Amino acid sequence: MFRIFQSFAIVLFCLLSSLSLGQGVNIPSPNWGIGIGNSTRFNGLRFNFIDRNIEEINGLNLTVWYDKNFEDHTGTFKGLGIGVPVAVGTKNRYGVSAGIFAVGAGNDLAGVNIGGLAVGGGRNVAGFNVGGLAVGAGGNIRGFNLGVLAVGSGNHLTGINVGGIAVGAGGNITGLNFGGLAVGSGGNITGVNLSVLVVGSGESIRGISVSGLVVGAGETVSGINIGGLVVGAGESVNGINLSALAVGSSEIRGMSAALVVGGEEVTGFSVAPAYFRITGENGAMKGIALSAFNHIKGFQQGLAIGIVNYAFEISGIQIGLLNYVRENRKGLRLLPVFNARFD
């Protein structure tokens, strides 16, 4: 029985190879039924050695090999596709596709796609996509995407994205994103973002972001942000911001807690056991600051509690061992216990 099956497989392999350059043998019609060979337009059950110069295939397609000349990857496939070793060969692929090594399309790939090593599209990838190593697209990725190593998009990434090492996009990332080492975007990151090392964005981060080392953005960070060492942004940090070492930005709004908290304008409730700092030409603290040293090189509006408190100008109260207000007249600038503005 095994020998019969083996002989049939060899004959089928040779037949597919010989028909791969032609139109194939199709029963009962040239365009539908059961097809063997490189039929470029067909509906039904189709077996082929290499797909090339396809127009449109609908149904169940089994391909043995792939064409290394990507100019021959044309047309559209819709249905259930199985590739040994890869399910590729068309510009667009829609439906359910599985490849021992990879599943791919020159342009768009949508549906359920499982590749032993990778799933990729030259333009967009959408649906449920699992790559043994990676899921990638030159354009956008949408849906549920799992790459044991990485999920990466040249443009936007949307949905549930899990990369064993990293999740990254050249544009925006939106949804639930977990990168074993990093979640990174050249644009904005929005949603729930988890990483062992870094969550980083070239523009803004909004939502819940948790990272073992750093949560950082070139512009703004907003929401609930927890960085093992640092939470920071080039313009502003807003919301609940927690870090073991530092929270820093030009503007900080909300509740912030770290060993060091600093910025040009800090509004809200800040806890910095080691050092709280306001600096800049228009520096201001508005709210409550708790720190061993509240170093406000600007305007304090609110309450500062610490061992040492320092402010240029004040509309509020300092409580601590040593309290200094530079705008007060001599004799009232440095006081124990508390200080305020004395005209």
Spans of model-derived segments:
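Bacterial N-terminal signal peptides that target proteins for export
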Residues: 1-9
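Repetitive helical segments and hydrophobic/amphipathic motifs
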Residues: 12-15
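N-terminal signal peptide c-region/cleavage motif recognized by signal peptidases
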Residues: 17-19
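Surface-exposed, glycine- and small/polar-enriched segments that build interaction surfaces at terminal
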Residues: 22-343
